[in-house]
Curated annotation (Swiss-Prot):
Its EC number is 2.7.7.7. GO terms for molecular function: 3'-5' exonuclease activity; DNA binding; DNA-directed DNA polymerase activity. It is an enzyme of class 2 (transferase). SUPFAM superfamilies: Nucleic acid-binding proteins, Ribonuclease H-like. Residues 1393-1437 are annotated as: Contains the active site of the enzyme. The keyword Hydrolase applies. InterPro entries: DNA_pol3_alpha_NTPase_dom, DNA_pol3_finger, DNA_PolC-like_N_II, DNA_PolC-type_N_I, DnaE2/DnaE/PolC, DNAPol_HHH, DnaQ, Exonuclease_RNaseT/DNA_pol3. This is DNA polymerase III PolC-type. Keywords: Antibiotic resistance, Cytoplasm, DNA replication, DNA-directed DNA polymerase, Exonuclease, Hydrolase, Nuclease, Nucleotidyltransferase, Transferase. Changing E427Q: Destroys exonuclease activity; decreases polymerase activity.
Length: 1437
């Protein structure tokens, strides 16, 4: 029996070492044990013999064996076998293990392996039935391979299973197969002979292997290469090639090496498996890396494990990567001035680092970054440019809007109610006033509220109409065949309108066509008539409407619109709409035509303007700061669907910026498509340079019929270059880059597709916007002639780049706030508090420590950080909430004396609160002052206070005391918002911001996008192709957010725009806080970040204080009954069988998890310092598992002696006699996992540091600070005190603050019901949902509470709180928000309604309490509404 417990304990230790102690695993490992461990020293191999109660699910088995192999790979090669007590075998579990069984087999011919891989066996009794093609195969399987398969299954824990075979193919097929295989084998034999001769020759010449990677045999250059999209089914011996985007090498239990990698040739992707045939292969496989291009030769098979077609490769050869070159001569390379990174939200996919690297490889001197409306890639761009030695131009593609769109044109002082109006509409062949023509012009004259005349005419365009125009307007070619020419129609219309006021819906369009026709056809000036645009007038009068389209407005005002998009019907409807609008305008005091534009730029006018794209490039540091200001304005004050920059603001902050005309969504290109040359010239004069892009980039405009044909498109581009010449503005050719290579476009397509109709880019085929070489760009613009192409592609882009300075968007130094007198205040506060504790004549150890710390703190300008932290903590303490410290701030005595932390870092000591007598223990004999025995003052008889944790200051600010202090504070979660707002009081609202974060597309989300895209387009994708596409879509910006506790402080001698733009988190313009636009990590070293975190522990402590009246600071830290819960359950009055736990620490912070509870079982701590050790051990990496755990288990040392926290190392080594500076150095190296140098080991040995201690140091990877551990344990001990001595108060606080998921129905029923639900959840294992796992923790505490003699009542309509569990005798009344589906707001509504008066009926409760029918039924079903009638009763008296 004792041996059994040892075996199980060893297995539990092993599980901790391989990190498999989660509840999801432990369900299967409950009765597991290590029966034997066989060790072969010569071969460095270990074999574990496990025993389990039942067969492990394959997923669990696979995880166990993988972690075993990985965990001990540096020590030995690990294998294992399993013995099962109750092996219940099903066909499904046999099939789950099948692929692993086949992988592990050795010495089986490839055809048989292929045959077995293509199927899963059937189970009949104890027989595995597989299908074969021939008698020979069947005989081989039964006679030769059956025992091998049986042995493999036995290793997994299965009973003996016999293999049987059924034949299902003809002998003819087999013969054909044999002949084919014979031919292949002969060819491979010949090739093997050639390779052997080649190797022998190389060996004779004593040449070292070099050159590209070759695994297996060389693949000939002339061998046919199959594209991956052509592979549709299983095939024998084909060759493919592609880019390796994922690779994994693993050693199988059999000793063979398996290499699994995925390649793509951008037509598709495939997973390739290759088994090493010899040691040389295995070594070479490790050289196969992601990013290589390879050829692979092998067979295509259906893999039952991955359920997909895969290649089983025999040969893999590295080949030269396919890359594009920029062959333009040095000095004649282009500069890309329009480029997007993944910070262009859900639109661009290639990281800025890769784009910069490519530009450098091509020999480009500079590159510009111009993300959509943001500058969040600037920090990464700066790093990449510095790394690759290339000039970075920092810019942005802005959404430019006019401050207000005119309602009236050609303003005239004419009384609106007396005027005659011509309401007109044109139908056209397209949208371009320059390249398209009018096909219908209709108008009505309105005077005195009535239509007095009509004009209607078709015009012959002398070219066929497009299908789109016919569908949109209902006008056909036949209807226009006999119509007059446009010139005649325009002439007649001009005469008919006279000088009346013209009215149109979206007048800029109609007037554009009219004015071009006037000039082009009649050769007269554009119309001088006053104009009213009913679209803009509608936006001004009815801003609450979602849109202001003609049909929308007509529907709103019950105006009949018979046939929309036919001119005559549109004009009549617009006429009646005008009459309504003029009446509403008059009510706003608008009487004259020239008053219509008076409100143009006011209020939300920026929302009514359509945004145009414009490129902004920062020329110098002034420009950079102005760019930051514009980004901030666009996100804070002018955000409407997208961040917008009003033209007036751009003019205001234009200094230091170059403004480019951007893409087809810029106003210059659109103007050249649709407006007269004079108008475009006027528009272009605003810009510093004009942009044109390759015709391919504008291809969607042809699809959308915005441009008639390729010829018209090239004419527009040519006209922009001519306009640049005329205005003496450089015209530059840009690529509008969204990804690196053309094959990357699929990633962008998937991201845009995921946004559905919300993204207008989904309405057309996406253009090709890869990063183009100089040659590609020159070719794209060759239609302009060689000289002009070179000018816009090379000369002008270099010219613009030369205008830009080298700019640093990120600063080098830290800029902390300044508070007058901070140094003196911290010094005075420290000494005042020290003297109040230790007396006017401070003990030398105290004064020396204070002076040492103040020298560093004040000397390096850190006093202000201490003072700020002090003010924040003091405010919280004054408001009744304790604050817990995190990190190593408790290493600073000054932090203790200024009340930033409760942790006292001095050596353990007594101090008298009455006469200040003190006694210090600075020899290392005591771990914590809290562990000293109680003692009275020898001078005055007062009980002495015990304190001190012996933590060196160096662990906080470094040995020289010059490390920037990182003070993290745990405030109560419910007090955190007040602490945040207090920083506004301390520094001013314009000097504090929440630390910004950027949320990118995660792997799971990308997987959803890829699957959605495949489904929408009826694509069947192989798993490898899905993986490739997922990789390409991850990391793209999806949203922004804020750090949960980080507050960035800008000193008052700087402003935020010196460091970062600002915005609202997730562009939520109603947010209380603004955030930094940059991710806070980017400016972490430039500005002070206060970590004001929200934590449950202070909230629990506050609730317990309120319930009990006990000041938590008076709670003893060495209460014997409290200490017992860390060893057992005795002080709770229950047995471990009752609560299913061997300790009493369920629900105690830091000590309630299964992993730490196991540590407690192993170590049985009895003191505060040992609890601190356990906290340090549990948070470190390789500090407990395989290290301290073994030292304690093997009785080499006690818990108190092992290395638990990083500070222990420095303190211990100083006590042993090492120089403090060396002790500090060793601590820093060890805590970062860097081990020890031979010199340090020698010095440690010279000072009698034991060998086990030195070995322990060498194993550690990461260590926890002792101050952090001490702060956590202090909170834990205080909460544990209530659990032991005030149980119901503890449970009320726990369930109120910490628990989120309840099953109140079960909890009310008591222990038996709770256990049953817990067993159900445990039985689900890995399949249990996150909600169920959270509920399990709550139920553990509920069970413990019930077993201690307490109970839960049902929710009470008149006594339940909204959110808190209420104590009633020996039971708890649950709050309303514990009811399933009832949130906190709904719970508060019920309580509010209850306070207003008693509920008369269920109907009254539902109405006043805003309770849903489901919640009402729940309350009724559980007897909470017994006294209430269904409906209100009317009384006659």
């Amino acid at each position: 029996m004792e041996q059994l417990s040892v075996n199980r304990r060893q297995f539990q230790i092993l599980l901790q070492q391989i990190n498999m102690t989660d509840d999801t695993f432990m369900t299967y490992f409950e009765h597991g044990e290590i029966k034997k461990l066989t060790i072969h020293k010569a071969s460095k191999s270990w074999h574990f013999h496990f025993q389990f109660k039942s067969l492990l699910p394959f997923q669990i088995y696979d995880t166990l064996t993988t972690r075993l192999t990985q965990s001990f790979a540096h020590i030995a090669k690990v294998t294992s076998s399993i013995e099962v007590q109750d092996a219940e075998v099903s066909e499904s579990i046999v099939q789950d293990y099948w692929s692993r069984c086949i992988e592990e087999l050795q010495g089986i011919s490839p055809p048989i392996i292929s045959l077995l891989n293509q199927q899963k066996p059937k189970l009949k009794g104890n027989k595995l039935i597989v299908k074969t093609k021939t008698d020979t195969e069947a005989a081989a399987l039964k006679n030769k391979y059956s025992s091998m398969i049986q042995a493999e299954y036995r290793q997994f824990g299965f009973p003996d299973l016999q293999l049987d075979a059924e034949i299902f193919v003809s002998e003819q097929e087999v013969q054909k197969f044999r002949e084919q295989k014979l031919a292949e084998d002969q060819e491979r034999a010949m090739q093997a002979l050639i390779e052997m001769e080649k190797k022998d020759k190389e060996s004779d010449e004593d040449q070292a292997p070099s050159g590209p990677l070759v695994i297996g045999y060389q693949i000939k250059d002339n061998e046919e290469i199959r594209t991956l999209d052509s592979i549709m089914d299983e095939e024998r011996r084909i060759t493919v090639q592609g880019y390796v985007f994922d690779v994994e090498t693993r050693e199988l239990k059999s000793g063979r090496t398996l290499c699994i990698f995925k390649i793509t040739d951008y037509t598709n992707s495939i997973l390739i498996k290759m088994f090493a045939r010899e040691k040389e292969d295995a070594a070479l496989m490790k050289s196969l890396k992601k990013g290589m291009w390879v050829k692979a030769r092998g067979s295509i098979q259906n893999d039952t494990f991955v359920r997909d077609l895969v290649m089983i490769a025999n040969d893999v050869n590295e080949i030269k990567a396919k890359t594009r070159e920029d062959s333009a001569p040095e000095g004649e390379k282009r500069v890309e001035l329009h480029l997007h990174s993944p910070m262009s939200q859900m639109d661009a996919v290639t990281g800025i680092g890769k784009l910069v690297e490519q530009a450098k490889k091509w020999g480009h001197e500079a590159i510009a970054l111009t993300d959509h409306a943001v500058v969040q890639s600037f920090p990464d761009a700066y790093s990449a440019a510095k790394k690759h030695g290339i000039k970075m131009i920092y810019g942005m593609e802005a959404n430019l809007v006019d401050d207000g769109v005119p309602i009236a044109y050609n303003a005239a002082h004419r009384l609106l109610e007396e005027e005659t109006y011509v309401v007109f509409d044109v139908e056209t062949t397209g949208l371009s006033a320059v390249y398209d023509t009018i096909i219908e012009l209709a108008a009505v004259k309105v005077k005195g509220g009535e239509i007095i005349d009509k004009f209607e005419a078709f015009a012959n365009p002398h070219r066929p109409l497009s299908a789109t125009i016919i569908e949109l307007t209902g006008i056909t070619d036949d209807m226009l065949q006999d119509a007059p020419d446009v010139v005649d129609v325009i002439r007649d219309f001009r005469e008919w309108i006279g000088d009346d006021i013209l009215v149109a819906h979206n007048a800029s369009f109609d007037m554009g066509f009219l004015n071009v026709a006037y000039k082009k056809l009649l050769e007269v000036e554009k119309a001088k008539n006053p104009v009213i645009d009913t679209l803009e007038l509608g936006r001004f009068l009815y801003p609450e409407f979602k849109n202001h389209r003609l049909n929308t407005l007509c529907k709103k005002f019950d105006i009949e619109l018979t046939q929309h998009h036919r001119a005559i019907y549109d004009t009549e409807a617009t006429a009646y709409l005008l009459l309504k609008m003029l009446k509403d305008a008059a009510e706003k005091g608008i009487q004259y035509h020239d008053e219509l534009n008076e409100n143009m730029g006011q209020s939300n006018a920026y929302q009514r303007s359509r945004p145009y794209h414009a490129t902004l490039l920062a020329v110098n540091s002034t420009g950079l700061k102005n760019l930051f200001k514009l980004v901030s304005l666009s996100h804070i004050h002018y955000f409407y669907r997208v961040p917008r920059i009003p033209r007036s603001q751009l003019e205001k902050y234009r200094e230091g910026l170059l403004i480019g005309s951007a893409c087809d969504r810029g106003e210059v290109f659109e103007g050249m498509m649709q407006k007269s040359p004079e108008e475009v010239e006027d528009i272009a004069s605003f810009y510093d340079y004009l942009e044109v892009q390759p015709p391919e980039v504008y291809r969607h405009l042809l699809e959308l019929e915005l441009v008639r044909d390729e010829k018209a498109l090239k004419e527009i581009i040519a006209n922009i270059t001519k306009l640049g010449e005329k205005l003496n503005k450089p015209v530059v050719a840009t690529g509008n880059v969204h990804y690196l290579n053309d094959e990357d476009k699929i990633y962008r397509k998937i991201l845009i597709s995921s946004q559905g109709g919300a993204n207008p880019l989904n309405r057309h085929e996406l253009p090709k916007v890869h990063f183009r070489t100089t040659d590609e760009m020159l070719e794209a613009f060759s239609f302009l002639g060689e000289e002009k192409a070179k000018e816009i592609v090379v000369t002008n882009t270099q010219k613009v780049a030369s205008l830009v300075d080298d700019i640093k968007p990120i600063k080098d130094d830290l800029y902390t706030p300044k508070i007058e007198g901070a140094d003196e205040e911290i010094r005075e506060m420290s000494y005042q508090r020290a003297r109040s504790i230790y007396g006017e004549e401070l003990p030398e150890i105290v004064e020396a420590r204070i002076e040492k710390e103040l020298k560093s703190i004040i000397g390096h300008g850190f006093a202000v950080i201490y003072l700020i932290s002090h003010k924040l903590v003091k405010r919280s303490l004054d408001d009744g909430y304790l604050v817990g410290s995190r990190g190593s701030v408790g290493s600073s005595l000054v932090a203790t004396l200024t009340e930033i932390t409760e942790v006292n870092p001095l050596p353990p000591h007594y101090v008298c609160p009455e006469c200040q007598h003190s006694e210090f223990f600075n020899d290392g004999s005591v771990g914590s002052g809290f562990d000293l025995p109680d003692k009275t003052c020898p001078h005055c008889g007062t009980p002495l206070k015990k304190d001190g944790h012996d933590i060196p200051f160096e662990t906080f600010l470094g040995f020289k005391g010059d490390k920037v202090p990182d003070i993290d504070l745990n405030f109560s979660g419910e007090y955190q918002p007040q602490a945040h707002n207090y920083t506004k009081v301390l520094f001013g609202e314009d000097n504090v911001y929440r630390a910004g974060t950027i949320g990118t597309v995660a792997e799971k989300t990308a997987y959803g996008y890829v699957k959605g895209y495949a489904g929408d387009n009826n694509l069947h994708m192989r798993g490898a192709e899905i993986d490739r596409l997922v990789q390409g879509c991850t990391g793209v910006k999806r949203t922004t957010g804020q750090h949960p506790g980080g507050i960035i402080v800008v000193p008052d001698y700087m402003d935020i725009y010196d460091f970062s733009p600002i915005q609202f988190p997730a562009d939520a313009t109603g947010s209380e806080w603004k955030t930094t636009h940059f991710d806070f990590h980017s400016i972490h070293d430039n500005l002070l970040k206060l970590d004001i975190l929200g934590h449950d522990d202070p909230t629990v402590i506050r609730m317990l204080q309120d319930l009990s009246g006990i000041d938590p600071k008076t709670i003893p830290t060495d209460d014997p009954e409290v200490m017992k819960i860390f060893q057992g359950t005795e002080s709770l009055g229950v047995t471990e069988e009752q609560i299913g736990c061997k300790t009493g620490t369920l629900g105690i912070p830091e000590f309630g998890t299964r992993f730490v509870r196991q540590m407690l079982e192993d170590t049985k701590p009895t003191t505060f310092s040992e609890l601190v050790q356990i906290s340090g051990l549990s948070h470190g990496t390789d500090v407990w598992l395989g290290n301290a755990q073994e030292l304690i288990h093997n009785n080499i040392c006690e818990l108190s002696e092992v290395i638990g926290c990083r500070d222990d190392i420095m303190v211990y080594l100083i006590y042993q006699g090492l120089e403090p500076s060396l002790a500090f150095k060793i601590m820093e190296f060890v805590r970062k996992g860097k081990g020890l140098t031979p010199e340090w080991e020698e010095e440690m040995k010279n000072n009698n540091v034991p060998d086990w201690y030195i070995d322990s140091c060498k194993k550690i990877k990461y260590m926890f600070p002792k101050a952090h551990a001490a702060a956590y344990v202090l909170m834990a001990v205080r909460i544990a005190y209530f659990k032991v001595h005030h149980a119901l108060l503890y449970y009320a606080a726990y369930f109120t603050v910490r628990a989120d998921d309840f099953d109140i129905d079960t909890m009310i029923k008591g222990s038996t019901a709770i256990r049953a639900v817990m067993e159900d959840i445990n039985a689900k294992g890995l399949d249990a949902s996150p909600k169920e796992k959270n509920l399990l923790t709550v139920l553990e505490l509920a069970l413990e509470m019930c077993e201690r003699g307490y109970s839960f009542q049902k929710v009470d309509l008149y006594r339940s709180s909204a959110t808190e569990f209420i104590i009633d005798g020996n039971s708890l009344i649950p709050p309303f928000n514990s009811i399933p589906g009832l949130g906190t707001n709904a719970a508060l509504n019920i309580v509010k309604a209850r306070e207003e008066g008693e509920f008369l009926s269920k109907e009254d409760l539902q109405k006043r309490g805003k309770v849903s029918k489901t919640i009402l039924e729940y309350l009724d079903r559980h007897g909470c509404l017994e006294s209430l009638p269904d409906q209100n009763q009317l009384s006659l008296f």
